[in-house]
Amino acid sequence: MQNTAKKATLPATALAALGVVFGDIGTSPLYALKESFHAAHGLGIQPENVLGILSIIFWCLMLIISIKYVAIVMRADNNGEGGIMALLALNLRKAKIADNKKIYMIAIGFIGASLFFGDGIITPAISVLSAVEGLSIATDVFDPFIMPIAIAIIVTLFLVQKHGTAFVGKFFGPITLVWFLSLGILGIHSVIQTPVVLGMFSPHWAIQFIYHHPIMTFFVMGAVVLTVTGGEALYADMGHFGPVPIRLAWFFVVLPCLVLNYAGQGALLLRDPAAIENPFYLLVPQWALYPMIIMATMATVIASQAVISGVFSLARQAIQLGYLPRLSIKHTSESEEGQIYVPFLNWLLLIAIIILILIFKTSSNLASAYGLAVTLTMLCDTILVAVFIYSAWKWSLPKVLLLIIPFFILESVLVGATSLKILSGGWVPLLIGAIAVTILMTWKRGRELTFAKLEHDTLSLDLFVKSIGNSVHWVPGDAVFMTGTPNVVPHAMLHNIKHNKVLHQRNILVTVVIEDVPFVAPEERITTETLAEHFFRIKIFYGFKDEMNVPKALLQAYEQLGLEYDLMHISFFISRDRIVHSVGDGMSPWREKLFISMQRNTSPVSDFYQIPTNRVVELGSQIEI
């Protein structure tokens, strides 16, 4: 019966995956082929060039998406979860690499994650602009309004984020299915008129194009890469839908419809080279133009929503793994744990997208900024997957290299091709990536220095417990001390003794530990230890995708210790650390200032761990790093 249920839900899950996983790659036909014949390339629209570029597009889709991501990368899962942060956490756990060498792997993961943040800015801008630009095909009247309409759509999209997308999300899959079927039908209609375009499936057209235009190929590849945007999404969303529905949707709906549409656009160019102005919308019959513009706008909004949700999810993973400062995270759905809203990131993305639209003005101009982010992220994935295959699958090094080198070479060529556009827009993802990497690395290093200082300067907990005796006054109730260093006395406890001259009858030291897995089983959530008559140590283990609720976890811990649990009789003591600069080894002064600024603006511990505010006592302390 269970297998039957699974089979029954598989098509439904694949349909849901369409609206989340494939929105980005599904909107590429709006601009990708047009950019391949950009006037700056000086490439004539002759049949051999059209077939050559179409062949390159087809084989890039097959090699990068079908083989690399669908067949290989999606097997590198972290307890069912995918995405570059999950892969990094998995490699840090599995790979036998010296600690001083792990920094290089962390850096690669950080670069890939940072570029994905950049993708969250560029994708909504280029997608929505390219959809709205269809209005200029219908009439010139709309030309002055294209940018304002695009910005209005983007603003509306971000305004509704705080309300969640649980309700409208039900329609994303069906709408995206209609979109893909529309792509396929438009393509078939055009291919029937010019069937010679089907020669694109033969690799000899791609090889011939590369042979006759080696330098031009390099420039063209910078635009062809736009056809494989969103490959990372297949992997990143694997934990939400599972690999089988994603593969099913790709091979039976997405890939055929994309290929047919690119073939249809190519067939149109063979019939009418002037259609290069906008081959996607000129493929559409005049009577269907406005409905198609509406459909394209909905598809691009859905694609943008998927990327925004992906950025929120990635940020939460980075926060829980200790790579980003605590940010306020709101849950927008009672039934879907993954539906979250990060206010700070929401407004940051909105402002950045509007600035991007105002600077670049058209989707063609933005295409230069888009490609570099995509190719560098792919290259980071390839390197981390190679480490995974070597360490987790125990493949020999020659075998790993034989599998990975072809992808590495192809993606290195794509990186090189898109790097030529740094001055015309490629600087955008590089700038965003550099800022994000700096933040990630600075926060990670700052935390390491802070914890090292706490370990060094604070009393040993075991020594303190043995020596405390009756030298303090004991008061009724429970005191929970949140601490990141479980083997030393928390600053908050020392300050409580110093200022209040008391300790509670039960003093419970709680440390939250984030594991390198997405979820921790409930039975493995808690470890408890009785240190002495009045002292207990509790460790709460979470995965990097778990929702953290300390009061709920404490109930389980109290049961293990055989203690009576009453939240209204528990005081949570939290140390509010004030980080100050000190002379000596550590970070450069500007990084210390950045870390101190981030530390001061973190979300309160009580909010992050869902501790009732009226049960919290905050005590300040100063730490020099």
From Swiss-Prot:
Report TM segments. 13-33, 53-73, 103-123, 141-161, 172-192, 206-226, 250-270, 282-302, 340-360, 369-389, 400-420, 422-442
- Highest taxon of the lineage: Bacteria
Q: Which HAMAP family match?
A: Kup
Question: GO CC: one term?
Answer: plasma membrane
This enzyme catalyses: K(+)(in) + H(+)(in) = K(+)(out) + H(+)(out)
Entry function: Transport of potassium into the cell. Likely operates as a K(+):H(+) symporter.
Q: In its keyword annotation, does this UniProt entry include Ribonucleoprotein?
A: no
The places in or outside the cell where this protein is found are: Cell inner membrane
- GO molecular-function annotation terms? potassium ion transmembrane transporter activity; symporter activity
Q: Which family does it belong to?
A: Belongs to the HAK/KUP transporter (TC 2.A.72) family.
Q: How does it sit in the membrane?
A: Multi-pass membrane protein
Q: Does the keyword Chaperone apply?
A: no
Entries under Pfam families matching the protein: K_trans, K_trans_C
The record's listing under InterPro entries reads: K+_transporter (IPR003855), K_trans_C (IPR053952), K_trans_N (IPR053951), Kup (IPR023051)
Q: Keywords on this record?
A: Cell inner membrane, Cell membrane, Ion transport, Membrane, Potassium, Potassium transport, Symport, Transmembrane, Transmembrane helix, Transport
Record-given protein name? Probable potassium transport system protein Kup
